[in-house]
């Protein structure tokens, strides 16, 4: 299995609130980056290695909006150009570190790790529910010791809820329900409806109405690592499958995974809802509950990665339930192939 990831893509690097006027290091797609918020509020993202001796700039300090290397005091501005060298007046014109394109959107800081000429802000994944006033919610970041694509696999096939999350969001109906898969050049959608079923514990608590429900899970994948899941329940027979969700409760599970290395990733997630939006305690309770659910996934995924590390020649076998994940993998492979040449592109087709 390839451990490649596309570089010509926007990746979430941090929650916006985590980037302050201080040096914040993070490894993304195998590249060491240091971020900080400038005095004008804009975020700068630089290669975390001094031009002089490669010491991480994150070991230094900020002087205004200038990064000062902690080893020999070279200074770099927010664009990565050296503005000071000790004991000399002339600054070598090649003295600069790479600056990465940055977009702040949907409560995340997004970095473009590839060719900066291709960094179109319009390509930032759509996660607008995360800062839409009609929706309320919150989330967290998980450092998962697995290939980011394993998290994508996990989210594209929610059959596992029956077996991993039976005490909260899963029950037998999830594993047995039929589903549809559609796909585009950089997107995959998996749609699953479960009609006239018993609500699992989490959704029963949210709906607060007795009786059978119609439940939906509509998974939207945006390459290379964003998965937004439209979820909810409504009393059975009240029109939800036909488009009227007014009698139910609706949420979105927003997920975006950023490769750190070939076998580790940063997993940013949030759960947002369009009901009881002013209840901060509910926001906190759901966030902590979902964090517990995702910890169950983390245990499984890290165990899976360890098994893969120990058995590098073993391959995956696919079931019908893997259709969404398989298409997501194909989309990612094609993105990588476009960056690495025609031979790789042919292999991805």
Region annotations inferred by a language model:
Residues 2-136, 188, 252, 349:
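Rieske [2Fe-2S] iron-sulfur-binding domain
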